[in-house]
């Protein structure tokens, strides 16, 4: 779906500025994005406080359940993230072709590498004008895969392996993910990697938010509003 | 001797009454988590089955497993199990020494070929052809391979035999390895711990002798009945964990009130063992009850995970050691600084180029 509309500037005598808009992100995908964003925030904060708990609660144990609530929020958000991710994989099959960009990085295409290089130069301030992209730019696509897809899968697998320890032997989580613990060595090693994974995703979120804001301002297409409304707007009508 | 002695014969010969014997069977059934109906079955098995000899080898170790084992708290286990299990060879506990001891080992191996159980305490060092541990003038690794050849099953006592323990800790100069790296063709039951709990040891061995099969094992080869849950899952201080009440310092109010030791490095949440249920010394206490966190002695490589008083593993880098949070925070800080710098340059460039924008 694409839309072309002409906007007259001011009194309309100097030039007609065209803005082309393309419908990129469908509603389920946008919903998934913001639900995942929220669950990552919840997971990061609660996860940190599981590893380094808040100061001791006063009073009797029976009157407090702070760690219980924090852990509940962590596990609930973990379920939301993991199930949402499965839904996202499903959407890659049934959604539009932009929905597949997250999972299928076209590393076999020479042109893609060329554009990747162009994008690297753009971020190093060596290119004056960026290229236009309907979906992700190559660098963004690669980063989304390496940081988000790999990171989320890693955190889900190690997370459910740790969750299985609480559910107990022969629980569904233990049958599905219990093999992860001996793979890493022992439980404490999985905890350590899960911690490192959190920081990996923290770095991802920082870079992701910064670049989304930055591109929204200096690139030639809309970024943030696209993930809200689904339409990619272009700021000029020069080619590519 | 036309027929081989049964356990019951041996126990009666040791002066144990039938009443005591039946009490022992009930206690064993209870200890193994079996119903009352199993007590007569255990009694029957012990009356009819020829006893299985156990050959107990000692490799590179500190003998803490033996020390724990001989303190088994069941009233009768101390008297019975030692005679009952027909410990035909254990160079620490047996009366014979030297050539007689080695002769007893060879005789049992010959007479009970494929029937005896091999229990290994400690582990073999592989470096320098195994010369870091010499038993009877020969490297322990040779004795281990020799005895394991005709064994029915193998028990790995303690963290040494199961995982490697302190002698296999970095940098492991003797190249000590857990026994499953050497014995690859026999079923191995791992009973980790440094040492394992006495009742766990006697429980495992009694199960194997009475039922003639291995107990149900988990993925890492540990009996599920004793290593199925973490210390944390059955810890009596768990309500304080859920409430968010922690010992922050060793001398604070929380320590006096018996709050959770999570923040002072308790490894209970990552350690599979029976300490919080079976406890130690006739069920008297266990480390957490004594006010000190679990150090995770039954877990693989527990010596190499950094401080016993930190929850997070120490990650060695180029000479400095940090934990996951310190590394993560440093990286996040670096990336944050990079983002700020990049944003600043972006803003400057944008101002510079303002004139020639379309």
UniProtKB/Swiss-Prot annotation, chain A:
Any single GO BP term: respiratory electron transport chain
Record-stated family: Belongs to the HupC/HyaC/HydC family.
Predominant location: membrane
GO MF annotation terms: electron transfer activity; heme binding; iron ion binding
Protein name according to UniProt: Probable Ni/Fe-hydrogenase B-type cytochrome subunit
SUPFAM superfamilies: Transmembrane di-heme cytochromes
Entry's localization field: Cell membrane
Highest taxon of source: Bacteria
Signal peptide: none
One Pfam family from the record: Ni_hydr_CYTB
GO terms for cellular component: plasma membrane
Topological category with respect to the lipid bilayer: Multi-pass membrane protein
The species this protein was found in: Azotobacter vinelandii
Role noted for this protein: Probable b-type cytochrome.
Transmembrane segments: 31-51, 75-95, 142-163, 196-213
Keywords: Cell membrane, Electron transport, Heme, Iron, Membrane, Metal-binding, Transmembrane, Transmembrane helix, Transport
PANTHER family in alphabetical order: NI/FE-HYDROGENASE 1 B-TYPE CYTOCHROME SUBUNIT, NI_FE-HYDROGENASE 1 B-TYPE CYTOCHROME SUBUNIT-RELATED
Curated annotation (Swiss-Prot), chain B:
PTM annotation: Predicted to be exported by the Tat system. The position of the signal peptide cleavage has been experimentally proven.
Protein EC: 1.12.99.6
UniProt keyword list: 3Fe-4S, 4Fe-4S, Cell membrane, Iron, Iron-sulfur, Membrane, Metal-binding, Oxidoreductase, Signal
Residues annotated for [3Fe-4S] cluster binding in this entry: 275, 294, 297
Cofactor note: Binds 2 [4Fe-4S] clusters.
Record's GO cellular component terms: [Ni-Fe] hydrogenase complex; ferredoxin hydrogenase complex; plasma membrane
Keyword Membrane applies: yes
Membrane topology per record: Peripheral membrane protein
Biological process per Gene Ontology, one example term: anaerobic respiration
Chief localization: membrane
Alphabetized InterPro entries for the sequence: Cytochrome-c3_hydrogenase_C, NADH_UbQ_OxRdtase-like_20kDa, NiFe-Hase_small_C_sf, NiFe_Hase_small_N_sf, NiFe_hydrogenase_ssu, TAT_signal, TAT_signal_bac_arc
Location within or outside the cell: Cell membrane
Function of the molecule: This enzyme recycles the H(2) produced by nitrogenase to increase the production of ATP and to protect nitrogenase against inhibition or damage by O(2) under carbon- or phosphate-limited conditions.
Protein name from the UniProt record: Uptake hydrogenase small subunit
